[in-house]
């Protein structure tokens, strides 16, 4: 897919990124009841994301075409201290966010953003990249599997009845 560039985030992208994060949050609210209204939380969420990116060898990358915002991907290097896991599992790349505008979904842009995140993470020395997805988000799961991601851990949830 031609006609777009992927470049580092600039502060002038903030409004478009927050709007994208709100759109993503509102979509995820249709998939699971744990998601709060996007407009209420995404400004603070993005502030925290920027801090994590700065502290953890990360990047926020923007896809655009002629100045039109098309999407974003954010990634960090995450370090865990799980004594039962290998070193390359404990220090891994993590894609925190990915978003593509609705009229470009299915065009290959998500794949290009994922590659760009991998290109950013590779020089850090990580050999694994992870991404989380809501179980009900079949479209995202297909995109990640198409890109070569495989299920790693599966988390189950059960609601408990209120007890007195």
Predicted segments with their positions:
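Conserved N-terminal entry element of GNAT/NAT acetyltransferase domains
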Residues: 1-15, 164
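Conserved GNAT-fold acetyl-CoA-binding loop/helix
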Residues: 25-48
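Conserved acetyl-CoA binding element of GNAT-fold acetyltransferases
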Residues: 86-102, 154-157
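Conserved GNAT acetyl-CoA-binding A-motif
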Residues: 121-132
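A short helix-loop-beta-strand connector motif used in the catalytic cores of GNAT acetyltransferases and
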Residues: 46-61, 94
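Conserved active-site alpha-helix within GNAT-family acetyltransferase domains
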Residues: 111, 123, 135-153, 158
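Conserved beta-strand in the GNAT
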Residues: 62, 68-77, 94, 99
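Conserved acetyl-CoA pyrophosphate-binding loop and the N-cap/start of the following alpha-helix
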Residues: 104, 108-116
